[in-house]
Protein backbone atom coordinates (compact mmCIF):
# COMPACT_ATOMS: atom_id res chain seq x y z
CA UNK A 1 0.00 0.00 0.00
CA UNK A 2 2.84 2.36 0.92
CA UNK A 3 4.66 1.48 -2.31
CA UNK A 4 1.54 2.28 -4.33
CA UNK A 5 1.20 5.68 -2.66
CA UNK A 6 4.83 6.49 -3.37
CA UNK A 7 4.36 5.61 -7.03
CA UNK A 8 1.30 7.84 -7.24
CA UNK A 9 3.21 10.68 -5.59
CA UNK A 10 6.09 10.31 -8.06
CA UNK A 11 3.68 10.28 -10.99
CA UNK A 12 2.02 13.45 -9.72
CA UNK A 13 5.40 15.16 -9.34
CA UNK A 14 6.40 14.16 -12.87
CA UNK A 15 3.12 15.51 -14.21
CA UNK A 16 3.62 18.81 -12.38
CA UNK A 17 7.17 19.19 -13.69
CA UNK A 18 6.12 18.27 -17.23
CA UNK A 19 3.19 20.67 -17.20
CA UNK A 20 5.45 23.43 -15.87
CA UNK A 21 7.96 22.89 -18.67
CA UNK A 22 5.25 22.80 -21.34
CA UNK A 23 3.63 25.91 -19.89
CA UNK A 24 6.95 27.75 -19.82
CA UNK A 25 7.71 26.63 -23.36
CA UNK A 26 4.34 27.91 -24.52
CA UNK A 27 5.32 31.35 -23.19
CA UNK A 28 8.35 31.55 -25.49
CA UNK A 29 8.03 33.62 -28.65
CA UNK A 30 9.84 34.06 -31.93
CA UNK A 31 10.69 37.76 -31.92
CA UNK A 32 11.14 39.27 -35.36
CA UNK A 33 12.04 42.59 -36.89
CA UNK A 34 13.93 44.22 -39.71
CA UNK A 35 17.06 46.32 -40.11
CA UNK A 36 17.63 49.02 -42.71
CA UNK A 37 21.08 50.44 -43.44
CA UNK A 38 21.68 54.01 -44.57
CA UNK A 39 24.94 55.58 -45.72
CA UNK A 40 25.97 58.57 -43.62
CA UNK A 41 26.95 60.38 -46.83
CA UNK A 42 23.60 59.76 -48.53
CA UNK A 43 19.97 59.40 -47.38
CA UNK A 44 19.51 56.49 -49.77
CA UNK A 45 18.81 53.12 -48.19
CA UNK A 46 21.31 50.33 -48.84
CA UNK A 47 20.07 47.40 -50.91
CA UNK A 48 21.42 44.82 -48.46
CA UNK A 49 21.60 44.87 -44.67
CA UNK A 50 23.39 41.73 -43.46
CA UNK A 51 25.40 41.04 -40.29
CA UNK A 52 23.62 43.39 -37.92
CA UNK A 53 23.37 41.88 -34.43
CA UNK A 54 20.24 42.48 -32.36
CA UNK A 55 19.87 41.11 -28.84
CA UNK A 56 17.61 41.33 -25.81
CA UNK A 57 18.67 41.70 -22.16
CA UNK A 58 16.23 41.56 -19.21
CA UNK A 59 15.20 45.09 -18.25
CA UNK A 60 16.01 46.50 -14.82
CA UNK A 61 13.62 45.05 -12.26
CA UNK A 62 12.39 42.34 -14.62
CA UNK A 63 12.69 38.72 -13.42
CA UNK A 64 15.59 36.71 -14.81
CA UNK A 65 14.68 34.42 -17.69
CA UNK A 66 16.25 31.31 -19.19
CA UNK A 67 15.69 29.77 -22.58
CA UNK A 68 14.54 26.15 -22.38
CA UNK A 69 16.06 25.18 -25.72
CA UNK A 70 19.78 24.57 -26.19
CA UNK A 71 22.01 27.62 -26.14
CA UNK A 72 25.18 28.31 -28.10
CA UNK A 73 27.21 27.07 -25.10
CA UNK A 74 26.11 23.50 -25.93
CA UNK A 75 26.78 23.77 -29.66
CA UNK A 76 29.94 23.08 -31.62
CA UNK A 77 30.96 26.51 -32.90
CA UNK A 78 33.61 26.89 -35.58
CA UNK A 79 35.41 29.73 -37.32
CA UNK A 80 37.00 27.98 -40.29
CA UNK A 81 40.08 29.26 -42.11
CA UNK A 82 39.75 28.46 -45.79
CA UNK A 83 40.92 30.20 -48.98
CA UNK A 84 42.59 32.88 -46.83
CA UNK A 85 39.24 33.82 -45.28
CA UNK A 86 37.31 33.18 -42.08
CA UNK A 87 33.96 31.42 -42.35
CA UNK A 88 31.62 32.73 -41.10
CA UNK A 89 32.72 36.35 -41.14
CA UNK A 90 30.61 37.09 -38.03
CA UNK A 91 29.91 34.68 -35.16
CA UNK A 92 27.73 35.52 -32.14
CA UNK A 93 28.02 33.35 -29.02
CA UNK A 94 27.06 33.37 -25.37
CA UNK A 95 29.71 34.16 -22.78
CA UNK A 96 31.24 30.83 -21.76
CA UNK A 97 31.09 29.29 -25.22
CA UNK A 98 34.13 27.73 -26.89
CA UNK A 99 34.93 28.27 -30.56
CA UNK A 100 37.05 25.94 -32.68
CA UNK A 101 39.49 27.45 -35.19
CA UNK A 102 40.33 24.73 -37.77
CA UNK A 103 42.83 25.39 -40.55
CA UNK A 104 41.47 24.01 -43.84
CA UNK A 105 44.09 25.75 -45.98
CA UNK A 106 47.20 23.92 -47.26
CA UNK A 107 49.49 26.41 -45.50
CA UNK A 108 50.14 27.98 -42.10
CA UNK A 109 47.94 30.49 -40.28
CA UNK A 110 48.43 32.49 -37.09
CA UNK A 111 45.07 33.52 -35.65
CA UNK A 112 45.09 36.24 -33.00
CA UNK A 113 42.93 38.85 -31.28
CA UNK A 114 44.69 41.45 -29.16
CA UNK A 115 42.52 44.54 -29.33
CA UNK A 116 39.09 44.13 -27.69
CA UNK A 117 37.02 41.37 -26.15
CA UNK A 118 38.91 38.08 -25.75
CA UNK A 119 42.68 38.42 -26.18
CA UNK A 120 44.57 35.40 -27.55
CA UNK A 121 47.33 34.34 -29.94
CA UNK A 122 47.21 30.80 -31.35
CA UNK A 123 50.65 30.99 -32.93
CA UNK A 124 51.62 29.24 -36.15
CA UNK A 125 49.68 26.09 -36.93
CA UNK A 126 49.66 24.00 -40.06
CA UNK A 127 46.99 22.62 -42.36
CA UNK A 128 44.61 20.13 -40.80
CA UNK A 129 45.13 21.30 -37.23
CA UNK A 130 42.71 23.14 -34.96
CA UNK A 131 42.61 25.06 -31.70
CA UNK A 132 39.81 25.93 -29.27
CA UNK A 133 39.28 29.35 -27.67
CA UNK A 134 37.04 29.86 -24.63
CA UNK A 135 35.21 33.19 -24.82
CA UNK A 136 34.79 33.86 -21.11
CA UNK A 137 34.13 37.59 -21.22
CA UNK A 138 31.55 39.80 -22.84
CA UNK A 139 32.59 41.93 -25.79
CA UNK A 140 33.54 42.15 -29.45
CA UNK A 141 36.67 40.26 -30.49
CA UNK A 142 38.25 41.25 -33.80
CA UNK A 143 39.99 38.18 -35.24
CA UNK A 144 42.95 38.43 -37.63
CA UNK A 145 45.76 36.33 -39.09
CA UNK A 146 49.32 37.47 -38.49
CA UNK A 147 50.40 36.14 -41.91
CA UNK A 148 47.53 37.20 -44.17
CA UNK A 149 46.30 40.79 -43.59
CA UNK A 150 43.20 40.26 -45.74
CA UNK A 151 41.78 37.80 -43.21
CA UNK A 152 39.41 39.23 -40.60
CA UNK A 153 36.37 38.14 -38.61
CA UNK A 154 34.35 39.12 -35.56
CA UNK A 155 33.30 37.00 -32.59
CA UNK A 156 30.74 38.71 -30.39
CA UNK A 157 30.17 37.25 -26.91
CA UNK A 158 26.92 38.24 -25.18
CA UNK A 159 25.50 37.70 -21.69
CA UNK A 160 22.18 36.57 -23.14
CA UNK A 161 20.91 33.70 -25.32
CA UNK A 162 18.36 35.95 -26.98
CA UNK A 163 20.02 37.30 -30.11
CA UNK A 164 19.73 37.25 -33.88
CA UNK A 165 21.77 38.34 -36.91
CA UNK A 166 20.19 40.03 -39.91
CA UNK A 167 20.18 38.24 -43.25
CA UNK A 168 20.97 39.92 -46.57
CA UNK A 169 17.50 41.49 -46.66
CA UNK A 170 17.78 42.83 -43.12
CA UNK A 171 15.39 40.34 -41.53
CA UNK A 172 16.12 39.35 -37.92
CA UNK A 173 14.65 36.45 -35.94
CA UNK A 174 15.30 35.82 -32.23
CA UNK A 175 13.85 32.43 -31.19
CA UNK A 176 12.75 31.19 -27.79
CA UNK A 177 12.22 34.53 -26.04
CA UNK A 178 10.09 34.28 -22.84
CA UNK A 179 7.49 36.96 -22.35
CA UNK A 180 8.63 39.95 -20.35
CA UNK A 181 10.43 43.29 -20.45
CA UNK A 182 13.78 43.60 -22.21
CA UNK A 183 16.32 46.16 -23.31
CA UNK A 184 16.94 45.88 -27.05
CA UNK A 185 20.51 46.50 -28.17
CA UNK A 186 22.14 46.49 -31.59
CA UNK A 187 25.63 46.27 -33.10
CA UNK A 188 26.99 46.84 -36.58
CA UNK A 189 30.65 46.97 -37.55
CA UNK A 190 30.36 50.20 -39.52
CA UNK A 191 28.11 52.14 -37.14
CA UNK A 192 29.42 54.52 -34.48
CA UNK A 193 28.80 53.75 -30.78
CA UNK A 194 26.59 56.83 -30.47
CA UNK A 195 24.46 55.76 -33.44
CA UNK A 196 24.01 52.29 -31.96
CA UNK A 197 23.24 53.62 -28.48
CA UNK A 198 20.49 55.83 -29.88
CA UNK A 199 18.68 52.72 -31.16
CA UNK A 200 18.64 50.97 -27.79
CA UNK A 201 15.27 50.92 -26.06
CA UNK A 202 13.02 48.91 -23.76
CA UNK A 203 10.58 46.48 -25.37
CA UNK A 204 7.88 44.23 -23.97
CA UNK A 205 7.43 40.76 -25.44
CA UNK A 206 3.92 39.38 -25.03
CA UNK A 207 1.37 37.30 -26.88
CA UNK A 208 0.30 40.41 -28.79
CA UNK A 209 3.75 41.99 -29.20
CA UNK A 210 6.42 39.83 -30.83
CA UNK A 211 8.14 42.31 -33.13
CA UNK A 212 10.59 45.13 -32.49
CA UNK A 213 9.68 46.79 -35.79
CA UNK A 214 12.23 48.41 -38.09
CA UNK A 215 15.66 49.59 -36.93
CA UNK A 216 17.29 52.20 -39.15
CA UNK A 217 21.06 52.09 -38.81
CA UNK A 218 23.35 54.78 -40.21
CA UNK A 219 26.71 53.34 -41.23
CA UNK A 220 29.82 55.32 -42.06
CA UNK A 221 32.79 54.50 -44.25
CA UNK A 222 34.87 56.92 -42.18
CA UNK A 223 35.52 54.23 -39.57
CA UNK A 224 39.07 52.93 -39.95
CA UNK A 225 38.93 49.13 -40.06
CA UNK A 226 42.60 48.72 -41.02
CA UNK A 227 44.77 46.81 -38.55
CA UNK A 228 48.38 46.04 -37.68
CA UNK A 229 49.92 42.63 -37.11
CA UNK A 230 50.15 41.11 -33.64
CA UNK A 231 53.36 43.06 -32.95
CA UNK A 232 51.66 46.37 -33.66
CA UNK A 233 53.56 46.78 -36.92
CA UNK A 234 52.56 47.03 -40.57
CA UNK A 235 52.31 43.79 -42.49
CA UNK A 236 55.26 42.98 -44.74
CA UNK A 237 54.13 43.38 -48.38
CA UNK A 238 54.08 40.08 -50.29
CA UNK A 239 56.87 39.39 -52.73
CA UNK A 240 56.00 40.08 -56.39
CA UNK A 241 55.00 37.04 -58.40
CA UNK A 242 57.15 38.19 -61.34
CA UNK A 243 60.84 39.18 -61.16
CA UNK A 244 61.59 42.88 -61.21
CA UNK A 245 64.42 42.44 -63.72
CA UNK A 246 64.25 41.62 -67.41
CA UNK A 247 66.18 38.99 -69.25
CA UNK A 248 69.02 40.41 -71.37
Predicted feature residues:
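Extracytoplasmic copper-binding redox domains, predominantly the cupredoxin/blue-copper superfamily
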Residues: 27-248
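Sec/Tat signal peptide C-region and signal peptidase I cleavage site
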Residues: 22-26
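Bacterial N-terminal signal peptides
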Residues: 11-20
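Bacterial N-terminal signal peptides that target proteins for export
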Residues: 2-12
Amino acid sequence: MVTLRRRRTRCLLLLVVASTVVSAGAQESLVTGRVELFDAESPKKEANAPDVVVWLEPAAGAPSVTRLTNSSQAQVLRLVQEHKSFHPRLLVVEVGASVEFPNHDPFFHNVFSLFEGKRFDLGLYEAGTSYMVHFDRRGVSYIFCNIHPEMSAVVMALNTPFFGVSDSKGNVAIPGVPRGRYVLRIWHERATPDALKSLSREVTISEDSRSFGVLRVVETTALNLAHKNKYGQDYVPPLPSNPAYRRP
